[in-house]
Protein backbone atom coordinates (compact mmCIF):
# COMPACT_ATOMS: atom_id res chain seq x y z
CA UNK A 1 0.00 0.00 0.00
CA UNK A 2 2.81 2.39 0.80
CA UNK A 3 4.25 1.94 -2.70
CA UNK A 4 0.84 2.15 -4.42
CA UNK A 5 -0.57 5.22 -2.68
CA UNK A 6 2.01 6.80 -0.35
CA UNK A 7 -0.06 9.98 0.06
CA UNK A 8 -2.74 7.91 1.77
CA UNK A 9 -0.61 6.48 4.57
CA UNK A 10 -0.44 8.59 7.74
CA UNK A 11 1.98 7.74 10.53
CA UNK A 12 2.67 9.04 14.03
CA UNK A 13 6.25 8.41 15.11
CA UNK A 14 8.27 9.36 18.15
CA UNK A 15 11.91 9.53 19.10
CA UNK A 16 13.19 7.00 21.59
CA UNK A 17 13.84 9.06 24.76
CA UNK A 18 16.71 6.72 25.63
CA UNK A 19 18.26 7.06 22.15
CA UNK A 20 17.26 10.38 20.53
CA UNK A 21 19.68 9.78 17.65
CA UNK A 22 18.32 6.29 17.02
CA UNK A 23 15.45 5.25 14.78
CA UNK A 24 11.99 6.66 15.31
CA UNK A 25 9.30 4.39 16.69
CA UNK A 26 5.94 3.98 14.95
CA UNK A 27 3.19 4.63 17.52
CA UNK A 28 0.07 4.98 15.34
CA UNK A 29 -0.98 4.80 11.73
CA UNK A 30 -3.88 5.03 9.31
CA UNK A 31 -3.97 3.92 5.69
CA UNK A 32 -6.45 3.67 2.88
CA UNK A 33 -7.14 4.51 -0.74
CA UNK A 34 -9.47 6.73 -2.73
CA UNK A 35 -12.17 5.59 -5.11
CA UNK A 36 -15.40 6.73 -6.71
CA UNK A 37 -17.06 3.56 -5.40
CA UNK A 38 -19.21 4.45 -2.38
CA UNK A 39 -18.77 1.25 -0.35
CA UNK A 40 -15.68 -0.42 1.06
CA UNK A 41 -15.16 -3.99 -0.19
CA UNK A 42 -12.66 -6.72 0.62
CA UNK A 43 -11.31 -6.49 -2.93
CA UNK A 44 -9.94 -3.01 -2.17
CA UNK A 45 -7.56 -4.41 0.45
CA UNK A 46 -5.71 -6.56 -2.08
CA UNK A 47 -6.03 -4.62 -5.34
CA UNK A 48 -4.02 -1.43 -5.11
CA UNK A 49 -4.82 -0.66 -8.75
CA UNK A 50 -8.37 0.22 -7.63
CA UNK A 51 -6.96 3.40 -6.07
CA UNK A 52 -8.23 6.50 -7.88
CA UNK A 53 -6.14 9.52 -6.81
CA UNK A 54 -9.05 11.89 -7.48
CA UNK A 55 -11.71 9.49 -6.16
CA UNK A 56 -14.73 10.89 -4.36
CA UNK A 57 -14.37 8.73 -1.24
CA UNK A 58 -11.42 8.26 1.11
CA UNK A 59 -11.52 4.64 2.20
CA UNK A 60 -9.85 3.93 5.54
CA UNK A 61 -8.49 0.39 5.77
CA UNK A 62 -6.48 0.32 8.97
CA UNK A 63 -6.34 2.40 12.12
CA UNK A 64 -3.67 1.15 14.50
CA UNK A 65 -1.99 2.26 17.71
CA UNK A 66 0.90 0.68 19.59
CA UNK A 67 -0.55 -1.18 22.61
CA UNK A 68 1.40 0.91 25.11
CA UNK A 69 0.08 4.16 23.58
CA UNK A 70 -3.63 3.33 23.39
CA UNK A 71 -6.00 5.69 25.14
CA UNK A 72 -3.91 8.79 24.38
CA UNK A 73 -5.98 10.00 21.43
CA UNK A 74 -3.40 9.20 18.75
CA UNK A 75 -5.79 7.19 16.56
CA UNK A 76 -8.51 9.82 16.90
CA UNK A 77 -6.07 12.58 15.96
CA UNK A 78 -4.90 10.71 12.86
CA UNK A 79 -8.46 9.90 11.73
CA UNK A 80 -9.41 13.58 12.17
CA UNK A 81 -6.36 14.51 10.09
CA UNK A 82 -7.39 12.09 7.33
CA UNK A 83 -10.91 13.55 7.31
CA UNK A 84 -9.48 17.07 7.11
CA UNK A 85 -7.29 16.05 4.15
CA UNK A 86 -10.37 14.54 2.47
CA UNK A 87 -12.22 17.83 3.05
CA UNK A 88 -9.39 19.93 1.61
CA UNK A 89 -9.15 17.57 -1.38
CA UNK A 90 -12.84 18.05 -2.14
CA UNK A 91 -13.83 14.45 -1.48
CA UNK A 92 -17.42 13.50 -0.67
CA UNK A 93 -16.29 11.92 2.58
CA UNK A 94 -14.60 8.98 4.26
CA UNK A 95 -15.70 5.36 4.68
CA UNK A 96 -14.37 2.68 7.01
CA UNK A 97 -15.42 -0.61 8.47
CA UNK A 98 -15.35 -1.18 12.21
CA UNK A 99 -15.83 -4.12 14.51
CA UNK A 100 -18.98 -3.72 16.65
CA UNK A 101 -17.03 -2.74 19.77
CA UNK A 102 -15.46 0.24 17.91
CA UNK A 103 -18.63 1.67 16.35
CA UNK A 104 -19.03 4.12 19.25
CA UNK A 105 -15.44 5.33 18.91
CA UNK A 106 -15.89 6.22 15.24
CA UNK A 107 -19.36 7.67 15.87
CA UNK A 108 -17.76 10.14 18.29
CA UNK A 109 -15.50 11.21 15.40
CA UNK A 110 -18.53 11.94 13.22
CA UNK A 111 -18.95 8.65 11.34
CA UNK A 112 -22.47 7.28 10.88
CA UNK A 113 -23.08 3.54 11.27
CA UNK A 114 -24.66 2.10 8.12
CA UNK A 115 -25.06 -1.36 9.63
CA UNK A 116 -23.27 -4.62 8.96
CA UNK A 117 -21.12 -4.34 5.84
CA UNK A 118 -22.35 -6.27 2.83
CA UNK A 119 -19.01 -5.88 1.05
CA UNK A 120 -16.51 -6.86 3.73
CA UNK A 121 -16.01 -10.01 5.73
CA UNK A 122 -12.26 -9.38 6.00
CA UNK A 123 -10.61 -11.90 8.30
CA UNK A 124 -13.93 -13.67 8.85
CA UNK A 125 -15.12 -10.86 11.13
CA UNK A 126 -18.38 -8.93 11.28
CA UNK A 127 -17.77 -5.34 10.20
CA UNK A 128 -20.02 -2.29 10.33
CA UNK A 129 -19.64 0.12 7.45
CA UNK A 130 -19.35 3.69 8.71
CA UNK A 131 -19.43 6.88 6.68
CA UNK A 132 -18.58 10.51 7.34
CA UNK A 133 -20.14 12.62 4.58
CA UNK A 134 -18.45 15.92 3.79
CA UNK A 135 -20.14 16.90 0.52
CA UNK A 136 -23.57 15.93 -0.73
CA UNK A 137 -24.53 15.96 -4.38
Task: Enumerate the language-model features and the residues they cover.
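Short loop/turn motifs at secondary-structure junctions and domain boundaries
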Residues: 1-6
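Cytosolic beta-strand hydrophobic patch enriched in CBS
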Residues: 9-15
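Conserved acyl-donor/pantetheine-binding loop and adjacent beta-alpha core of acyl/acetyltransferases
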Residues: 20-25, 29-64, 70, 119-127
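Conserved acetyl-CoA-binding loop-helix of GNAT-fold acetyltransferases
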Residues: 65, 71-84
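Conserved GNAT acetyl-CoA-binding A-motif
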Residues: 79, 85-99
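C-terminal "cap" of GNAT-fold acetyltransferases
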Residues: 99-100, 109, 119-137
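A secondary-structure capping/hinge motif
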Residues: 113-115
